């Protein structure tokens, strides 16, 4: 996929994900994340890739989660139920072993990421 076909925030993050793709794998989006520990969330046609910066000694991990291992994707909000469903900029991706919470720079990015992950889970 050409860069103009991929939604992304930072070119260096897109390049980092592209360097780790499997043969034939396509990137749909790479969103910069805010908050402690998370660098970005990438969504491909085969998996979700999380960059985790929370390791001791300034080490960084890239974690791949195949869609078949994701048990749920959630919208996380501090508000009571009501109003716009996607007025939050945080989603959570759960597996049988952990839940990964990702805060984005805007509710529109959270909405897009949530819908892409959910679409792949339901295929």
What are these regions (language model features)?
Residues 92-111:
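Canonical phosphoinositide-binding patch of PH/PH-like domains
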Residues 30-40, 44-88, 94:
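Phosphoinositide-binding peripheral membrane targeting modules
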Residues 38, 57, 102, 111-113:
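Intrinsically disordered, low-complexity acidic/polar segments
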Residues 1-42, 94-96, 112, 123:
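Anionic N-terminal interaction surfaces
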């Amino acid at each position: 996929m050409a860069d103009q076909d991929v939604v992304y925030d930072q070119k260096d993050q897109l390049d980092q994900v592209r360097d780790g793709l499997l043969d034939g794998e396509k990137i749909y989006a790479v969103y910069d994340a805010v908050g402690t520990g998370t660098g970005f969330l990438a969504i491909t046609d085969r998996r979700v890739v999380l960059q985790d910066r929370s390791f001791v000694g300034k080490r960084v991990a890239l974690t791949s989660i195949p869609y078949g291992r994701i048990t749920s994707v959630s919208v996380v909000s501090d508000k009571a139920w009501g109003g716009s469903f996607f007025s939050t900029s945080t989603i959570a991706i759960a597996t049988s072993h952990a839940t990964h919470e990702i805060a984005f720079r805007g509710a529109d990015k959270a909405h897009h990421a949530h819908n892409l992950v959910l679409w792949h889970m339901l295929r």
